[in-house]
Amino acid sequence: MRLVVVAGPTASGKTALAIALARRLGGEIVNADSQQVYRGLDVGTAKPTAEERAAAPHHLLDLVEPGEGMDAARFAALADAAIAGIAARGRVPIVAGGTGLYVRALLHGVVEAPGRDPALRAALEEEAARLGRPAVHARLAAVDPAAAALIRPNDLVRVVRALEIAAGGRTPSELYRAHAFREDRYDAALLALDPPRAELHARIDARVRAMFAGGLLDEARALEARFDGALPARLPIGYAEAAAHLRGELDLEEAIRRVQVAHRRYARRQVIWLRKERGVAWIAPPHDVEALARRVLEPRPPAIR
């Protein structure tokens, strides 16, 4: 069975290409975007619309509530089940998303890491509350600069987890290097969209403005009400800024600007991650769907398996 993966930075057109390939190949789409697993966070995560979901079946959207956890190991297990079901129906599984850790876990397995340390976790969360999340991120940067560079300073959940791992004696980067992700769990065609930077930034900026005009503020308002103003530590980009605007802490243009900058930085991290993957076929627009459909179904030569 051939697995098709459509990856790339945010706003690069992954959903549109995945749907076009699904319609051409008779496929179903498996989400690999860590932000789109949350229920009720639709506009701010650019989740496929009802029309897009009607154009091709989608899996692994709306799995957990905001504030609940989802990690790469759990994602890979859920994706394995979805892919098996798609294959059993005689359809082509198409994985689409920009979360590199999820794609890597699915294609090459998961690193075995130390378990949770509740005492350390509590101490780090207290430090973040007292000194700010960037202070805890700086602690990670001191012990594992490479891991810190891949995690947003405000993503306290991932920062704390990385420090938990480092406290076990080996940093996350050391564990990843030792694992090396050599195992190929699937025969996969990995496509990565690669629009010119100026074009990508323009698309990001336009998308963020459309989010603010199209319901992001309503979603942030609902979160504020649900969590009584104390938003979960790990939310997709944009919700904290939208909530700050609703509280009168940011004017609208500044909130939009900050979210645009955050998405551009996220896109850069996504590209850096993908550049490290093996066997990536970088695709520049415009996309010839017919040619790509033929290409992804061609068996890989044994030498590059």
Curated annotation (Swiss-Prot):
Gene Ontology biological process terms, A to Z: tRNA modification
Keywords from the UniProt entry: ATP-binding, Magnesium, Nucleotide-binding, Transferase, tRNA processing
Species assigned in the record: Anaeromyxobacter sp. (strain K)
Designated name of the protein: tRNA dimethylallyltransferase
E.C. number: 2.5.1.75
Cofactor(s) in the UniProt record: Mg(2+)
Function: Catalyzes the transfer of a dimethylallyl group onto the adenine at position 37 in tRNAs that read codons beginning with uridine, leading to the formation of N6-(dimethylallyl)adenosine (i(6)A).
Protein residues bound to ATP: 8-15
Interaction with substrate tRNA: region residues: 33-36
GO molecular function, one term: ATP binding
HAMAP family reported for this sequence: IPP_trans (MF_00185)
InterPro entries assigned: Dimethylallyltransferase, IPT, P-loop_NTPase
Site (Interaction with substrate tRNA): 99, 121
Family: Belongs to the IPP transferase family.
Enzyme class, spelled out: transferase
The encoding gene: miaA
Entries under Pfam families matching the protein: IPPT
Subunit structure: Monomer.
Catalysed reactions, semicolon-separated: adenosine(37) in tRNA + dimethylallyl diphosphate = N(6)-dimethylallyladenosine(37) in tRNA + diphosphate
Annotated residues for binding of substrate: 10-15
